Amino acid sequence: MSMSDPIADMLTRIRNAQMVEKAVVLVPSSKVKVAIAQVLKDEGYIDGFSVKANDGKPQLEIALKYYAGRPVIERIERVSRPGLRVYKGHGAIPQVMNGLGVAIVTTPQGVMTDRKARATGTGGEVLCYVA
């Protein structure tokens, strides 16, 4: 059976792995998931990631990051979902925790943070909030 929301599955796997203090988590790979992982790495929420072929099916291996024994990601939640897409113009993209967190947005220029989307004047679909 196919997954109805693969991005929510990825975020849930990250959240669950951090609750049990795993070093890495494996997620089925896709271009959007790799782009989300790149944004998380650029913002310092994860240590790194790599795509590995596992029996012909690519797997995204995400190295989780901890500080003083606590997960760096305190909150990660899906915003736009298959049943209710959330699109925002560049002026309406929300700030997460007054700028302490990030909203990950997919735009015509690719997947980026809310700050970069506002700076480039581009709106798009708000995928998730990370803090």
UniProtKB/Swiss-Prot annotation:
A GO CC term assigned to this protein in UniProt: ribosome
Gene3D superfamilies: 3.30.1370.30, 3.30.1490.10
Keywords: Ribonucleoprotein, Ribosomal protein, RNA-binding, rRNA-binding
Database matches in SUPFAM superfamilies: Ribosomal protein S8 (SSF56047)
Disulfide bonds: none
Transmembrane segments: none
Protein name: Small ribosomal subunit protein uS8
Species per Swiss-Prot/TrEMBL record: Polaromonas naphthalenivorans (strain CJ2)
Organism lineage: Bacteria, Pseudomonadati, Pseudomonadota, Betaproteobacteria, Burkholderiales
